[in-house]
Amino acid sequence: RSLRERFEEAFWCEDLSIYALALDGQKRPCRVKTSNAGHCLYTGIASDEHARRVAETLMSDELFSGWGVRTLADSERRYNPMSYHNGSIWPHDNAMIAVGLARYGLKSGVEKIMTGMFEVSLVLDFHRLPELFCGFVRRPGQGLTRYPVACNPQAWAAGSAFMALQACLGLSIIASEQKVVFNYPILPEFIDKMQIKNLKVGTASVDLLLRRHDLDVGITV
């Protein structure tokens, strides 16, 4: 059997609509709703049907706080929005989930994550994305709750915005053929126009102008 078949059999939790966090010492699934399941979309090992259901779970109120996807669902016994790994929100984790969603064509979730990241940046000093922040539910008129000892700046947090944007654009590069590919690009509502200048692919380079329309994104080279 293929790796995907064995993975699906071992990790899929039908009643939870998500992949198990791990297998214990007796190979029993740890039936916990976590953001880690989004990484299965990032790697491409998830089946199309299960990817769609995982996306719905990740975007539900259990896991999506309004600012981002929590590491642990608020319905879980160990949930603590101020815990380092049991309910906090990590920008790099969300960016990987966004790329995974884009891989399966689930762009509404990508836009939701990208918008959350952008709005997080608006309420923080220097508009920097931190290593992590607390997973309390978002409330109207209130900012997020910071994680007191989160590194800021931090490299993988800083790179998360670009990774999430890449997911929105469906952007990939085939260096051997000097190609830039956009797969069903979208731009979130807060971006009407975007310029990418001097994008280098091998020995070539290109300038791009992207404009958001009601139903699609126009690209001018």
Sequence positions of predicted segments:
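Beta-rich accessory regions
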Residues: 2-7, 14, 102-112, 175-177, ...
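Aromatic- and histidine-enriched alpha-helix N-cap/loop-to-helix transition segments
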Residues: 31-35, 85-96, 102, 152-159
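Catalytic cores of secreted or luminal carbohydrate-active enzymes
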Residues: 147-197
